[in-house]
UniProtKB/Swiss-Prot annotation:
Orotate binds at residues 34-35, 132, 160. This is Orotate phosphoribosyltransferase. It comes from the Eukaryota. GO terms for cellular component: cytoplasm. Catalyzes the transfer of a ribosyl phosphate group from 5-phosphoribose 1-diphosphate to orotate, leading to the formation of orotidine monophosphate (OMP).
Amino acid sequence: MQAYKKDFLDLATKYEALKFGSFTLKSGRTSPYFFNLGLFNTGVALSTVGASFAQVIINSGVEFDVIFGPAYKGIPLAAVTAAKIAELGGEKYATKEYAFNRKEAKDHGEGGNIVGASLKGKKVLIIDDVITAGTAIKEAFSIIDANGATVSAVVIALDRQETTVDSPKSAVQVVSQTYNVPVLNIFNLNDVIQYTDGILTEDEKKKIEQYRDQYSPKE
């Protein structure tokens, strides 16, 4: 496992952003684990999140001009990742921009629904915590398109690697295939299973493996 993944997962368990047990999801499924990126709520935690996102982006080699964080959860992610990628990525990434959207457009002052860098004519990387139903990501694509830009990739913290309630594909697969862009992640369910070696009991780990086998995409 890459060092940035282990650092991220270590912190996720410390802050209880990644928990194990029995959790009812919005989909109605009962999951043996739960992830809430919002619990990375200190400066050092947020710095680790930004560094992890930055490392994923650098490793991928994806070309982009602007990091876009959909309101609201994506806003701090875009800002801290822009800062950390400038720190870790050298000159190539030193002037990458970031932006986010307002939930309601302003009709005074600077106006519009975008805060930060202009998107027009640029390659945009969308950053968010997870993709579940994909609704928030679809909205982000629409906003970016309406502002005259194109999406080069999506990067998320967690890929749950499970089917949606109405498709044999995962939400990540649906987004990637619908928009023809790569969807990158800091970690996925297989990483969680690997990470929990020696942390969870065999019974607890088996429940996660059974959940993966039941809901993993079959194509």
